[in-house]
Swiss-Prot record:
Annotated organism of origin: Legionella pneumophila subsp. pneumophila (strain Philadelphia 1 / ATCC 33152 / DSM 7513)
Statement: the UniProt record of this protein carries the keyword Secreted: yes
Main location: secreted
GO MF annotations in UniProt: serine-type peptidase activity
Function comment: Serine protease effector that inhibits host cell autophagy by targeting SNX17. Localizes to the host endoplasmic reticulum-mitochondria contact site and catalyzes degradation of host SNX17, thereby impairing endoplasmic reticulum-mitochondria communication, leading to inhibit autophagy as well as staurosporine-induced apoptosis.
Protein name in the entry: Serine protease Lpg1137
Organism lineage: Bacteria, Pseudomonadati, Pseudomonadota, Gammaproteobacteria, Legionellales
């Protein structure tokens, strides 16, 4: 531990004691490029699972849906806002992972409380920038909204962003905890010679672990969102938590507590885990694997001379430097 601290001190001296959180234009360009590549790949790879979840949830509720128009067309309906939301979410996720990586390298043991505060901050930032677009993509995919009956407005944006904020907050906290620092710990259990394989498998495992804890709140969030209606004035009408609670209470009264729980566990929970687990495994594996494969400088080959430029900007410290 002492040796590691000494090595990090040398690194800080070579960097001129600049803050690791202040990115140069070169570092920012690399981060933006990496974020875009990872986010688009994740969005394209997981959209089919969103389609399957939509079909599953509508079949469980017995509500007719607009999931029609051919397999590919139906599967990727609403992909544009989903991809844009993925870009925003990816920016938050990759930045969160990068921040934790810098913290580990520069301070080698950040306080546990500080890491959790960072996780909470980034999970809330993710909701703020992407929940509205993700909700629109979901409703568009199932045919609730379309170009004719939906227009962006402050009211509609707020409805889509806040409709399931509470349940998404819990799920997002778990996801970002695993992306930020717990996922690397899981990766350390794999002992392949190539660290890339360890990262991919660690990411996939983290995604499955996250699914076990986030399926219930995500299922509630999706159910609440999918009950959204469009009024005649193109304003969205969402259901309240009180309405959701009333529906669950009526169901429990009708079938009994034990039967309601077993139905939820066997039908809703396990079926959704079967879809959400591979979706999360692919998402986390791509984030961890592509982050490792691309490294901190994916643009190095198309931005020549940058290494020499850095060396000229940060000359080696004098041997007499304390």
């Amino acid at each position: 531990m002492i040796q590691r601290g000494f090595t990090m001190q040398e690194r800080r001296e070579k960097q001129g004691n600049n803050s690791p959180y202040l990115l140069t234009p070169y570092e920012m360009a690399n981060l933006v490029f990496k974020t875009g590549a990872i986010s688009f790949t994740v969005s394209a790879g997981t959209q089919p699972f969103q389609y399957l979840l939509n079909k599953l949830q509508f079949s469980q509720s017995g509500t007719p849906s607009g999931l029609s128009g051919g397999l590919f067309r139906g599967m990727y309906r609403g992909f544009l806002p989903y991809a844009i939301a993925g870009q925003k979410r990816g920016a938050v996720a990759v930045t969160h992972k990068q921040t934790n990586k810098v913290t580990e390298e520069e301070e080698f043991e950040a306080p546990f409380r500080q890491r959790w505060w960072g996780t909470i901050f980034f999970s809330q930032a993710d909701l703020l920038v992407s929940n509205g677009l993700s909700g629109k993509a979901r409703l568009q995919n199932v045919g609730v909204i379309n170009a004719e009956n939906f227009k962006w407005s402050l009211s509609n944006f707020w409805k889509l962003t806040s409709v399931n904020w509470g349940s998404r907050s819990f799920a997002g906290g778990v996801n970002f905890a695993l992306i930020g620092f717990a996922g690397d710990y899981v990766s350390s259990f794999y002992k392949f010679d190539k660290d890339l394989y360890n990262k991919i498998l660690g990411g996939a495992t983290s995604g499955v672990i996250a699914t076990l804890f986030t399926t219930a709140p995500n299922a509630y969030a999706d159910s609440k969102l999918l009950q959204t209606k469009v009024a005649e004035n193109n304003r969205l009408i969402t259901v309240s938590p009180y309405t959701m609670f009333g529906q669950m209470k009526s169901h429990v009264k009708a079938v009994g507590l034990k039967e309601a729980f077993m139905t939820f566990f066997k039908v809703s929970y396990l079926q959704q885990v079967a879809v959400r687990a591979p979706q999360a495994a692919i998402t986390f594996a791509l984030i961890f694997g592509m982050d490792e494969y691309m490294g901190p400088q994916p643009l190095k080959k198309v931005w020549p001379g940058r290494v020499e430029e850095l060396e000229s900007e940060n000359p080696s410290p004098s041997p007499t430097k304390k």
